[in-house]
C-alpha cells in the first residue's frame, strides 16, 4: 500500500469515538524568490493533527494533559468566515480552546479563561 493510502486508513480510524484527526499538508513554495513554508508547525510537522477528548479521572490528578488550541487572528475590521466559525465551534465542542482574537491580550484571554468543564 502506498503511504498516502495508509495515511487515509489511519485518519479514518482516528475519526471515531472521542478522537478527530485532519490531514496536515506541508509544503514549501517559492514566491518571488522567497520560500514560504505551509503546514503546522512547518517542516517536520506530522501528517495528521487532531484532538482527543479525555475525561479526567482521579488517576489523572497531577498529570499534564495537552489541550488543542486554535486562535483565529483578525484585525480590527476583519470578519470571520462561516467555515472559520464552524471550526472554532467544532474545537470547543470537543473540549479544545478556540476563539477569535484581534490582539495578543484577546488571545491570552481566550486561553486563560478556558474551563475544561462547563
Name the predicted role of every residue range.
Residues 1-118:
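Catalytic phosphate/metal-binding cores of nucleic-acid and nucleotide-processing enzymes, i.e., regions
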